[in-house]
């Protein structure tokens, strides 16, 4: 099966680097499936899971808070603001953060409070979607 080089990096660290058979991500225009030989592309990423299918058939899932996806025919690069391996996400902490963001939104005192709460809720939704993907994979 054909492969391509995939690099997933955040501001802090390299999360994944290796050969993959496919990458699935949520871009500005919706979900993208990238295969080896894909046409060149650059798009903004939405908060949510990046699914990387490895040569051995297993799948790595990484949460990204946003960033840029660059595709070349045999190389795909994810430059993420924040990237966390899905296995390292803490569901209880994320649910608590969602509760706090919803309270901030309900008690907004300014447009800045509202914007911060909405941005936080967007990231939290992406994290919860990533956790759901992990749980579905285990079934």
From Swiss-Prot:
Recorded topology in the membrane: Peripheral membrane protein
Top-level taxon of origin: Bacteria
GO molecular function, one term: proton-transporting ATP synthase activity, rotational mechanism
Assembly with partners or alone: F-type ATPases have 2 components, CF(1) - the catalytic core - and CF(0) - the membrane proton channel. CF(1) has five subunits: alpha(3), beta(3), gamma(1), delta(1), epsilon(1). CF(0) has three main subunits: a, b and c.
Keywords from the named record: ATP synthesis, Cell inner membrane, Cell membrane, CF(1), Hydrogen ion transport, Ion transport, Membrane, Transport
Protein name listed in UniProt: ATP synthase epsilon chain
Subcellular location: Cell inner membrane
Gene Ontology CC, one term: proton-transporting ATP synthase complex
Gene: atpC
Its biological purpose: Produces ATP from ADP in the presence of a proton gradient across the membrane.
Disulfide pairings: none
CDD domains (UniProt xref): F1-ATPase_delta
Family recorded in the similarity comment: Belongs to the ATPase epsilon chain family.
Xref: InterPro entries: ATP_F1_dsu/esu_C_sf (IPR036794), ATP_synth_F1_dsu/esu (IPR001469), ATP_synth_F1_dsu/esu_N (IPR020546), ATPsynth_dsu/esu_N (IPR036771)
